[in-house]
Amino acid sequence: MSENQVIKPGGRLVGEVQVPGDKSISHRAIMLGALGEGETVVRGLLRGEDNLATLEAFRSMGVAFCEDGDGALRIAGRGLHGLQEPQDVIDCGNSGTTMRLMTGLLAGQQFFSVMTGDRFLRKRPMKRVVGPLTAMGAHILGRAGGEYAPLALQGKTLQGITHHSAVASAQVKSALLLGGLYAEGPTTVHEPHRSRDHSERMLTWFGADVRPFEGGVTLHPGSCLKGGEVIVPGDISSAAFFMVAALIVPGSELLIRQVGVNPTRSGVIDILRQMGGNIELLNERDCSGEPVADILVKASDLKGVEIGGAVIPRAIDEFPVISVAAAFAEGRTVIRDARELRVKETDRIASMCSQMGALGALVEPREDGMVITGGPSLGAAKVSSLGDHRIGMSMAVAALRASAPVTVTDTECTATSFPGFWELFNSVREH
């Protein structure tokens, strides 16, 4: 049954908040923990639906998991060659990360496997990973010539390649690096811009021979992965909703604790600062190879800016809520070079234009982005998540500056990346 949330405008955000663990890092911790020798203990793991899909995929291949009393996840690693052939189709749910990264990993196994997903995932492009993996010798079948799931894989030994990626995609890069663990010879990926590097960092943490260079990365196979402890920081994509909310609601001052601030992911901080946002990083430190900080955000008068180029892949998941910030900034904000937004859980350019437009925002779609003309406030209306977790949470933030309560429909999807979002969102607001 569809869930709805009614958001009343106003209510400054004050105090402290800690967001759930990083979704991208959680996926990779499960995957590499399963492939590692010995036990891996993961602390701070996100229990969102996407990550649970990854966990269940490995459970179906014989990996044992158990929960500690303190909330940590213990993974009994089976080593690089210890996975078992799954007896049923692997259901990736709504998770593009699960499907794309698993495609690389499964391509190098010595068994047969099939992956599918929900109606949204089955519309998302997979050829971008299927194509280069096929060049490595993988045998993968899918709808429309491998463009769409379900995907069927007959695993085999792969050959390392040098791949020049047309887009800066961490999922493509990660799929090839995971396939490269099972390849003869090195695997090299070149990118037009640097994408998030969580896979490289965690592969290195587990003992793989990964060599980043300007414009790309090379993995040399042959190293076994060693289990250990992984501490997952808070997800900057989840923190972004609270950052924008605190910036746009007058009188707000919010401290967001223990957030991952990896430079390949912190584009949202750079963009919001460029817009005039008062954002400060405190207590900077390192956890399991990832930079972490506490983020102090104070309400600010924002201004419109131009956003494009190398910052786009560093903030690709945050553009729905960045567009909310732009709706309250003085002047025009132009987002370009972001065509990748059209192939997310929904077409996020069309989704944000339609839902923000319903509230009266001046948002104009472009093929590779949008133009937003800011104003002091929005109207009130019933809006929808459209089944996309980031759209739903972005509309909740927009509602804080509406003229009357806003109803957001179909909000159950927020559990994909942020279970407990609505409770946390309400807890930091003064009523």
Curated annotation (Swiss-Prot):
Active site: 317 (proton acceptor)
Keyword terms of this UniProt record: Amino-acid biosynthesis, Aromatic amino acid biosynthesis, Cytoplasm, Transferase
Annotated phosphoenolpyruvate binding sites: 23, 96, 124, 171, 348, 390
EC number: 2.5.1.19
A molecular-function term among this protein's GO annotations: 3-phosphoshikimate 1-carboxyvinyltransferase activity
Binding-site residues for 3-phosphoshikimate, renumbered to this chain: 23-24, 28, 169, 171, 317, 344
Catalytic activity: 3-phosphoshikimate + phosphoenolpyruvate = 5-O-(1-carboxyvinyl)-3-phosphoshikimate + phosphate
Subcellular compartments: Cytoplasm
Pathway, per record: Metabolic intermediate biosynthesis; chorismate biosynthesis; chorismate from D-erythrose 4-phosphate and phosphoenolpyruvate: step 6/7
Main localisation: cytoplasm
GO BP annotation list: amino acid biosynthetic process; aromatic amino acid family biosynthetic process; chorismate biosynthetic process
Enzyme class: transferase
GO CC, any one term: cytoplasm
Role noted for this protein: Catalyzes the transfer of the enolpyruvyl moiety of phosphoenolpyruvate (PEP) to the 5-hydroxyl of shikimate-3-phosphate (S3P) to produce enolpyruvyl shikimate-3-phosphate and inorganic phosphate.
Entry-linked PANTHER family: AROM/DEHYDROQUINATE SYNTHASE, PENTAFUNCTIONAL AROM POLYPEPTIDE
Family the UniProt entry places it in: Belongs to the EPSP synthase family.
Subunit composition and interactions: Monomer.
The protein, known as: 3-phosphoshikimate 1-carboxyvinyltransferase
Organism: Syntrophotalea carbinolica (strain DSM 2380 / NBRC 103641 / GraBd1) (Pelobacter carbinolicus)
Lineage: Bacteria, Pseudomonadati, Thermodesulfobacteriota, Desulfuromonadia, Desulfuromonadales
The encoding gene: aroA
